[in-house]
Amino acid sequence: MFKTTREKGASFEQQARLFLEQQGLRFIAANQHFKCGELDLIMADGDTYVFVEVRQRKTILFGSAVESVDWRKQQKWLDAANMWLAQRNLSLEDADCRFDLIAFGRTASDIEWLPNFLD
């Protein structure tokens, strides 16, 4: 079993990465940290940057994994993506990008992929 929440999160992020690679996306980076927030996974779908948030909930007592992505989390996600793009002299306005959510239930096999979650 997992010793820490961080180890559990890393395991689900790895499962999400493998799932997305099986769907044809290419891995770019993981766990990119900025003052404004973190990017769990950055993938590429052709020429499109895909910023992936990975969420997991073992119970829906406090809401599902999808419901846990509130307005504040969405803003942090956008801000972190803009920071990552800025490091490459790009921005959300001029880069081809999208924001996908990978939501897990209790297990890694209980996976839901929501492309264009912030559309």
From Swiss-Prot:
It comes from the Bacteria. Pfam families: UPF0102. InterPro entries: Restrct_endonuc-II-like (IPR011335), tRNA_endonuc-like_dom_sf (IPR011856), UPF0102_YraN-like (IPR003509). GO terms for molecular function: nucleic acid binding. HAMAP family: UPF0102. NCBIfam families: PRK12497.1-3 (NF009150), YraN family protein (TIGR00252). Belongs to the UPF0102 family. This is UPF0102 protein Asuc_1462. It comes from Actinobacillus succinogenes (strain ATCC 55618 / DSM 22257 / CCUG 43843 / 130Z).
